Design a protein with these regions (language model features):
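Active-site environment of divalent metal-dependent phosphoester hydrolases
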Residues: 76-78, 111-122, 206-211, 244-250, ...
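Histidine-rich, glycine-flanked metal-binding segment
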Residues: 11-13, 21, 25-65
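Divalent metal-coordination and catalytic microenvironments
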Residues: 19, 39, 61, 69-72, ...
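His/Asp/Glu-enriched, well-ordered alpha-helical/loop segment
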Residues: 234, 307-372
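Divalent metal-dependent hydrolysis catalytic cores, especially in the metallo-beta-lactamase
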Residues: 96-122, 133-142, 197-210, 238, ...
Length: 372
């Protein structure tokens, strides 16, 4: 029904009758009717017990579930290449993101948590009904230390004081910002919040696509991470961090971070810490087939992550951590069509009910950390 519902005015009343309902939390489905008012579910009841004026859809006994949530999506970077990010004209890249947002919705994703990038304008266009797309929980610019996972500068670019006029293209468009020190991190976080960020995204460890770091690197001092946490908490929200290795995960948690992104190289002691502190772990079931990195070094880093994914998921289940799911598809427009396929990869560790709950109810709980 998503193609029909997506074309409706958000003020419309919609009654979907005679459907088999999965509510996101209960393993058994039930037959019933659903009333939607102003783009939100208003009532779920037994078949034939709701009367309403407006659009009526007969589900004819088909399966109906909450919209899918991708808790680690990059609305801008998923459909633009790295070369686009570094050199392309902004109108071109933003138009591509707008088209991709409609495709994302048609794949069944009604909400995404954007894990970094210039999407405030895209969110506004969707919210105002200018273009179709999912609800977006934006993070704004990725916040990175010099030489960190979000440092997209050329090799010959010199370090410069935070806030000076010599910004890179990626900083000017709002894709990433380099901030070193407590004061700079505080300003960067506050500026993202000023622009409408739902949460703050910080890079506290090395990454696969990085130009200047190793996968095992820890990034940012604890006091720098805590500065972002304090800025977020003052605004009623939280910090999510890109990180893979135990020491950097531990440092992030000690600084007050609420959502660990990736974490594939985690050890048992650190997983126990995540569980004890009730921190969220948002992982991606990466496989070797995902490897489209151009350099040998990047390919080796990706292989290391894939080889450790099974251990990380098994530890997460053992300690019953609060687990979210996202795709983190980046810099390959041809790969976005695999967003749904990545859900199926979870079958290596979870049954069908656990998977559906994770990509609906569990991810919704994760997103609720930023408030209403």
């Amino acid at each position: 029904f998503i193609d029909k519902i997506a074309s409706f005015d958000m003020e419309q009343t919609i009654l979907i009758k005679n459907v088999r309902i999965f509510n996101g939390t209960d393993e058994k489905t039930v037959m019933g009717d659903i009333l939607i008012l102003n783009n939100r579910i208003n009532k779920i009841a037994e078949p034939g017990t709701i009367s309403a004026e407006g659009t009526i859809i007969d589900g004819k006994g088909k399966f109906l579930m909450p919209g899918l949530i991708d808790a680690h999506w990059h609305s801008y970077m998923c459909c633009n290449t790295m070369i686009d990010l570094l050199t392309a004209e902004t109108y071109y890249t933003q138009l591509k993101a707008g088209v991709e947002a409609g495709k994302t919705l048609m794949r069944g994703f009604t909400t995404i948590r954007d894990a970094g990038g210039p999407v405030f304008g895209l969110k506004r266009a969707i919210d105002e009904g200018i273009i179709p797309g999912p609800r977006i929980y934006p993070s704004g610019s990725l916040i990175s230390q010099t030489g960190g996972h979000g440092d997209f500068r050329a090799v010959y670019d010199d370090p410069r004081p935070f806030g000076c006029c010599c910004l890179t293209h990626t900083e000017k468009i709002g894709a990433a910002i380099i901030a070193d020190g407590v004061d700079a991190v505080t300003v960067a976080a506050r500026n993202n919040l000023r622009l409408g960020a739902s949460q703050i995204k910080l890079m506290t460890g090395g990454g696969v696509a990085s130009l200047y770091d190793r996968l095992q690197d820890s990034q940012y001092f604890e006091e720098e991470i805590h500065a972002a946490v304090k800025a977020a908490e003052n605004a009623g929200t939280y910090v999510m961090v890109h990180v893979y290795v135990p020491q950097a995960i531990t440092r992030s948690i000690q600084a007050g971070v609420k959502s660990i992104e990736h974490g594939h190289l985690i050890d048992e002691a650190t997983m126990e810490l995540i569980a004890r502190k009730e921190v969220w772990l948002c992982m991606q079931p990466f496989t070797l087939d995902d490897n489209q990195y151009p350099t040998q070094e990047q390919q080796e880093k990706h292989k290391m992550i894939v080889q450790n994914a099974d251990n990380a998921y098994r530890l997460a289940k053992k300690y019953q951590v609060k687990l979210g799911w996202g795709t983190d598809l980046l810099f390959n427009p041809a790969n976005t069509k695999n967003q749904n396929k990545d859900i199926g990869k979870l079958k290596n560790w979870f049954n069908n009910f656990e998977i559906l709950r994770m990509v609906t109810y569990d991810n919704a709980r994760l997103l609720s950390l930023s408030g209403s």
